[in-house]
Amino acid sequence: MSFTNTPERYGVISAAFHWLSAIIVYGMFALGLWMVTLSYYDGWYHKAPELHKSIGILLMMGLVIRVLWRVISPPPGPLPSYSPMTRLAARAGHLALYLLLFAIGISGYLISTADGKPISVFGWFDVPATLADAGAQADFAGALHFWLAWSVVVLSVMHGFMALKHHFIDKDDTLKRMLGKSSSDYGV
């Protein structure tokens, strides 16, 4: 398996970004759902949001690097067996996932910095606040963050089901390419 993408398959770096992002996004979603259930006296009441913020900032940084990687090492093109509608749906779905992830990160940043304080990322560095005393900002961003998170989870589940559909029903190599396998549709 190559480090970079080829016309036939995704490389190690793209596959690692893909699967690591999925694990982190689902973990962050679970953490977010759990932390809103905590009472003020729970030991994790302050720790969980700090963890969520730190991982969220690192995820955003990783997302920027991932987008740059797509420019440096473009993903394989669509399989020849894809219909025009499948090609359009795949492009729209991938674009929507990226836009949702960026919007979740931005809304999380707005929630976290509404009090004018920077976000400490595991004590390694701080991300400065750009706006101060924006209580309404936090409320709006919080509602947006919630619905965007649910949207990315629903869309990513659909993304996974489509990969399984391609693998088990269409019997093409869509899923195999993300796992670093050769695509028989390309005669490899």
UniProtKB/Swiss-Prot annotation:
Sites where the protein binds heme b 2: H52, H145
- Protein name (database record): Cytochrome b561 homolog 2
Could you tell me the membrane topology recorded for this protein?
Multi-pass membrane protein
Question: What GO MF annotations does this protein's record show?
Answer: electron transfer activity; heme binding; metal ion binding
Q: Where are the transmembrane segments?
A: 16-36, 55-75, 92-112, 144-164
Which UniProt key words apply to this protein?
A: Cell inner membrane, Cell membrane, Electron transport, Heme, Iron, Membrane, Metal-binding, Transmembrane, Transmembrane helix, Transport
Q: Where in the cell is it found?
A: Cell inner membrane
**Name of a matching Pfam family:** Ni_hydr_CYTB
One of the GO biological process terms: respiratory electron transport chain
List all topological domains (Cytoplasmic).
1-15, 76-91, 165-188
Any one GO CC term of this protein is: plasma membrane
The UniProt family comment states: Belongs to the cytochrome b561 family.
Q: Which residues lie on this side of the membrane: Periplasmic?
A: 37-54, 113-143
Cofactor(s) the record lists: heme b
Q: Which SUPFAM superfamilies match?
A: Transmembrane di-heme cytochromes (SSF81342)
- Write down how the cofactor binds this protein: Binds 2 heme b (iron-protoporphyrin IX) groups per molecule.
The residues that the entry says bind heme b 1 are H18, H159
Where does it primarily localize?
membrane
